[in-house]
UniProtKB/Swiss-Prot annotation:
GO terms for molecular function: enoyl-CoA hydratase activity. Its EC number is 4.2.1.17. InterPro entries: ClpP/crotonase-like_dom_sf, Enoyl-CoA_hyd/isom_CS, Enoyl-CoA_hydra/iso. The gene is echA6. This is Probable enoyl-CoA hydratase EchA6.
Amino acid sequence: MIGITQAEAVLTIELQRPERRNALNSQLVEELTQAIRKAGDGSARAIVLTGQGTAFCAGADLSGDAFAADYPDRLIELHKAMDASPMPVVGAINGPAIGAGLQLAMQCDLRVVAPDAFFQFPTSKYGLALDNWSIRRLSSLVGHGRARAMLLSAEKLTAEIALHTGMANRIGTLADAQAWAAEIARLAPLAIQHAKRVLNDDGAIEEAWPAHKELFDKAWGSQDVIEAQVARMEKRPPKFQGA
């Protein structure tokens, strides 16, 4: 479900589920986690993460095992692996990054975004709640006001606007991302490791307040989540009740 190639000091990892728009199931998450962890065993000094086909990652595979009991823990381990990697991870965002795909993009240290790509958290369309890290990191990358629009109304963030906010560092292709990663790989690795560690320790990872956890659990355990799934299968708008 992933492809791994290396050119000199740049390791490229490609999500390879184009038929599902690279949606994350447990197997893909596990393979990606292991690839990130093993990346430091060789001569690589930078990682490029991209998706095969027209999407970077369409989020969690809602038709698969995304609601399995251990799926959230697997996803957390993936994010921990990316955060702990001593190498910079450059996201080559080749298409839409939605939901868990946007979380994956935000965990990258830098992002080169295709002109027709966009970012979206459609959680309010599915009755779901986001963890605190995702909300805090989104706010730091796009600004508080735009984060509110994305979270409360499921607004899409285009590549052009993402470049202005800082979500996108550059507009470009996979080749552009690989070229940038090659430049970075020639820089001093210890200096990069220190900068990455300090930047990532920005307070976005926090213990949820009791009120946050209560509302989070209430959303995930609600009938609205079931209604969203049923409506999706029946191809109709959901009728949310707030319960």
